[in-house]
Amino acid sequence: MTHRPLCILAAAVLTVAAIAAYAHAHPTKTTPEPNSIVSSPAQVSIEFSEALEPKLSKIQLTSEAGAVVSKAPSSVDTADAKHMTLALPTLAPAVYVVKWVSVATDGHKLEGSYKFTVK
């Protein structure tokens, strides 16, 4: 009895799983950077690995206690759908939390967060 068909099936499943994992839009560059200490930034900027679905992707800035800091909507750059920004008001010295949701154009969704400090 040969195990060749089973091996081929296993390889196919692993290949499909690997391709699906790459379809998620994960951050490749963030400004401000995670755990950084900065002067009040004018915006939060995140570059993603995949193009984003503008209506479903967002950035939110909160205080460490969870209060929303910026009421402005985030936006995906029309010239570069991998780039999303959130305009910020002048921030007081404190720790802030960037919460992001990325939905790739193929529908895959990821969420994450990171902190930075304004001095």
What label would you give each PLM region?
Residues A92-V101:
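A glycine-anchored, Pro-Gly-centered beta-turn/N-cap motif
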Residues S49, A87-P89:
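Surface-exposed loop and edge beta-strand positions of immunoglobulin-like domains
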Residues K82-L86:
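Short strand-edge motifs at loop-to-beta-strand transitions and within beta-strands
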Residues S45, A51-A72:
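Short, surface-exposed alpha-helix to beta-strand junction/turn motifs within ectodomains of secreted
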